[in-house]
Design a protein with these regions (language model features):
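Paired acidic/hydrophobic, glycine-rich loop segments that form the ligand-binding mouth/hinge
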Residues: 16-19, 157-158, 173
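Early extracytoplasmic/lumenal segment of secretory-pathway proteins
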Residues: 1-27, 166
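Short, intrinsically disordered, charge-balanced linker/junction segments flanking boundaries
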Residues: 1, 171-173
């Protein structure tokens, strides 16, 4: 994604079509490196989910430069037996409390805790956990999310967006 963005920003990237993540779109649009879509060339655009298009408006006002290609979710992966051994049988295994309550995460750190190296995923989840809009435009909301995440930082072994998959499967986190 960084390589693609760098090539686009430098000009003459050689790309005809790019698949940029939503968080990159505002910078690419502002820089004028994307061509506006031609609706007549996209007859199946009418079949796109209006709810997803509405969510994309925060990164692409008017949905003029992008269409959704992938849509995913972010969840919590953990070893239930390890969690219950550390936190007890009533551990909040179905709640974000499992990782966003420092008293839980401090205990779980002995098992190893990894977090996605993806602020664009983690910060909105923290905002939601705090009862704030995930796409807030209020700087104070982001300060609250930052304060929460800073409380958790000492208990996180590493940030990575792929290593945790193998480590979780092998019992390392």
């Amino acid at each position: 994604s960084d390589v693609m963005q760098s090539k686009l920003m430098a000009g003459r990237s050689g790309y005809d079509v790019v698949m940029a993540t939503g968080d990159l779109l505002p910078n690419l649009i502002k820089a004028g490196v994307l061509k506006e879509l031609e609706p007549a060339q996209l007859p199946n655009r009418s079949h796109l989910d209006p709810a997803i298009l509405a969510k994309m408006q925060s990164n692409d006002p008017g949905n003029r430069y992008a269409v959704p290609y992938l849509w995913g979710t972010t969840g919590i992966g953990y070893d239930v037996d390890k969690v219950k051994a550390v936190l007890g049988a009533d551990a909040p295994v179905d709640s974000w409390d499992l990782i966003f309550k420092p008293e839980n995460l401090s205990k779980l750190s002995q098992c190893g805790v990894a977090m996605l190296d993806a602020p664009g995923e983690i910060v909105p989840i923290a905002l939601h956990y705090l009862g704030l809009p995930y796409n807030s435009t209020n700087p104070q909301d982001y300060q609250k999310a930052e304060a929460l995440l800073l409380k958790l930082r000492p208990y996180i072994r590493y940030f990575d967006s792929s290593k945790f998959i193998t480590d979780l499967a092998n019992g390392n986190v």
